[in-house]
Amino acid sequence: MRMQQTLLGVGGLALSLMASSVMAQTLTQAEIDQLGTSLTPIGAEKAGNAAGTIPEWTGGLSPNAGQALGDNFYEDPYADQQPEFVITAQNYQQYKDNLTPGQIAMFERYPETFKMPVYKTERSVGYPQEVYDQVKATAGQAKLVNGGDGISDFSHGTFAFPIPKSGAEIIWNHNTRYRLNVHRWYMQAMPQTNGSFTLIKLEEEVGYPQQMSDVDESTMPNTLLFFKQRVNAPARLAGNVLLVHDSLDQLKEPRMAWVYNA
């Protein structure tokens, strides 16, 4: 099994799929031909925006853009960049249209200490060539099922809908994005307004059938991923384990999950 180890300070992204009335729309060859030309190889707009604040995508960072520092960390390829400007409690009103209510509240609650440096946009994402080749070869094959709650005709590839026609397809692009197997240790915290917090230390493993050399993909065509989480701290939660098998079509084969409480 190929593994990618990372150490994260915070993490977490929860997605909720809501059923909607969606219909499969077949891509034309002309649309597929846009991949790698007017669109990036995975379907994003290649050109920059009219305002000039988002640049053209030119391939992303090269594999040797940052030198390895050890312990799975790499040097910052943008270390020399300086902020274009800094948003503070004194000037946030002029940027209000681009700020969330939560960010505005932070400026108002902590006017002396909360600042938001803004850097130029960099389109640094790049994937292996085999990912681009696979996305183009399978474009138009995947189909939404069960009102968008699942997909079919998708055999453990990446970016199921590179030219999405609905919000549900965009969500499935996120769910099927290119990822390596992961073994990571990270911490979660929910700070109170007075600054106090309790750290929850977690260890997680995530495996994808197409990235697991000891798995026969043909025996599990509906499997999206395998997930295992162990709580290491605090003591009252230490030893708790969560195991999940997620599927592409959860009506055909519902999620399987097990919890062990120490």
Give residue ranges: language-model regions.
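Well-ordered beta-sheet/strand-loop patches within structured domains
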Residues: W258-A262
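N-terminal signal peptide c-region/cleavage motif recognized by signal peptidases
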Residues: A19-S21
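Hydrophobic helical h-region of N-terminal Sec-dependent signal peptides
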Residues: G11-L17
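Solvent-exposed N-terminal domain segments of exported/luminal and surface proteins
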Residues: Q29-E253
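Bacterial N-terminal signal peptides that target proteins for export
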Residues: M1-V10
